[in-house]
Amino acid sequence: MQKYLPVLRNCPFFTGLTDDEILSILHCVSAAKITRPRGSYIFRAGDSTEVMGLMLSGSALVIQEDLWGHRNILSKCNTGDFFGEPYAATPGAILNISVVAEEDCEILLLNVKRLLTACPTACDHHQKLIRNLVSVLANKILLFNDKITHVSKRTTREKLLSYLSAESIRQSSLSFDIPFDRQQLADFLCVERAAMSVELSKLQKEGLLVTKRNHFELLTR
């Protein structure tokens, strides 16, 4: 696990912990590294899990799918991001999301049950980790609240403007990149890609924004 310390140091889950403490925690919670190729499932809806995942390299999409293949993207996980925490922390909970590798990736699996029970070595840093987990979960709630705000808008135009405005504020810039390609953005906002493309063209003609691929620049009048 030594080679992954640069990633783990920058992960909010390990904030305030030394390298030795991080390695001790990984042993305590029976951390295991797995690899998954692009397009494969890491977690699948309908299953249950006792572990949460941490992206060591690559990226993955957290999605919901129906029986006809319609996809709703909930979030994107990049290096250092977690997924599956609420389900792993709730005994018997059935996943209503799937996590799919967007590219070849390495994932660290952490047993949440071991994290939430008394540490056999009574380590002081175990309590820090629990506090960090609460913070990570709270931040994820805020992110999902933002998504609800965007998709609750009535029109495709309103959804786009809501999302792009929020991204501009989050990144403190009128010029920014988003983590999605066009199809993924449509799936994230729960709109049809063709309709979204039409609205983006209108917004550019109206002088509200300039966009190329996943880069956007918002224009103020």
Region roles according to the model:
Residues M1-R38, Y87-T90:
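Cyclic nucleotide-binding regulatory module and flanking cytosolic helices
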Residues I22, L95, K113-T155:
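A small-molecule sensor/coupling module
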Residues C28-V29, D47-T49:
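Short, small/polar residue-rich loop motifs at catalytic or cofactor-binding pockets
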Residues G39, E50-I63, N78-G80:
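Glycine- and acidic-residue-biased ligand/ion/polar-headgroup-sensing regions
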Residues Y41-D47:
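Short phosphate-coordinating micro-motif centered on Lys-Gly-acidic
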Residues I73-R131:
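Cyclic-nucleotide recognition modules
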Residues R154-R221:
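Phosphate-/nucleic-acid-contacting segments
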